[in-house]
């Protein structure tokens, strides 16, 4: 087992990474607050891992809520169901919420924990690659709104993250590839050596070769933990974690939540960010080619869907958390391994990037 620490003073917590962790009862037990546990999971994950988790929680008063699966269910209405179940039991403010699932479950369960009785403890047990390397770490919790993705939420840190790599054995190929998009992101924004490693070993990660998979998860989590420790609430450097996300969120919202997986949209968004970075003179054609080649080898989209026309794309991008005083800011690449947040681009260059990306 590997442990990565997220250093946030009194709110610091560990990320546990390894095989068979769901069966190690003591790992979760030392982070559970109180004697009441609500497990939030979904219809896909529950038949696979809920019983295993509950076997380790026999000393607690447990309940579970099983939600429908998919980004389209990450809504205020479904969040209400979590609150309803917490209140019907009822659970006190000395309970612990456990999120068992991918990014959607983690985001919603975390947001519910942040709000319920003004905040209760929660634990992340991510079961997808994307959740293990990104969404479970850092305390971002949210639901979507029809006008924008993740626009209603809170920063609220978990007590721990338990990333059992065995859960990736049941992850379908599309979800695995989508998770690899967020792994690639870390190499692009701040870790060129990792990017180079991925160019050589992405096929091993996709083949679920254990040592490659664990290395990719650990390296990703260490990168994110360092960024979160430096800027928990995204007032500075943490914003670089959004490489590809402004474009990607526009794709997700424009197509309808769930049509593309989050990682697929981010992959297309990173390709667009690389293109705009080249137009600004920051990346060479060769460097952009390296980005596109890795995305292609990962089986990820490199273009935006033609269903979203340019005017609509720009309209959707304007509903973004990085917009300040009506000014759109984007995460772009000064070079491979170095990202910046900037509004220093002309609208005609942005429109040219959108035109080129749309297929």
From Swiss-Prot:
Annotated positions binding Zn(2+): 182, 245, 262
Annotated cofactor note: Binds 1 divalent metal cation per subunit. Can use either Co(2+) or Zn(2+).
GO biological process: amino acid biosynthetic process; aromatic amino acid family biosynthetic process; chorismate biosynthetic process
GO cellular-component term (any): cytoplasm
Documented EC number(s): 4.2.3.4
The protein's role, per its UniProt record: Catalyzes the conversion of 3-deoxy-D-arabino-heptulosonate 7-phosphate (DAHP) to dehydroquinate (DHQ).
Family statement drawn from the similarity comment of this UniProt entry: Belongs to the sugar phosphate cyclases superfamily. Dehydroquinate synthase family.
Name this protein carries in UniProt: 3-dehydroquinate synthase
Organism: Nitrosococcus oceani (strain ATCC 19707 / BCRC 17464 / JCM 30415 / NCIMB 11848 / C-107)
